[in-house]
Design a protein with these regions (language model features):
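Conserved RNA-binding domains used in RNP assembly and mRNA/RNA metabolism
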Residues: 1-75
Length: 75
């Protein structure tokens, strides 16, 4: 019996070139455009607004997010 391909919990392909909010384990939120990702959920975001709690923190033109630091993703 062949093993069926497992569906991904989150299909990042559908979110490419879309603004998303990445919730980081340390409480930060990154609001940016998803331009690339890999099988480890490492992501490249562009035009990123970082917030800590409700306070704006930083702005980044390009930011790499390590998949292991991601708690959740919302759109």
């Amino acid at each position: 019996m062949e093993e069926a391909e497992k569906p991904a919990a989150l299909d990042l392909q559908k979110l490419l070139n879309t603004r998303i909010v990445v919730h980081i384990r340390d409480g930060r939120k990154l609001n940016g455009t998803l331009t690339q990702y890999d099988e480890y959920m490492n992501m490249l975001l562009e035009d990123v607004d970082e917030t800590m709690g409700d306070k704006p923190a930083n702005k980044y033109k390009i930011l790499v997010v390590k998949g292991g630091n991601v708690q959740a993703i919302s759109i």
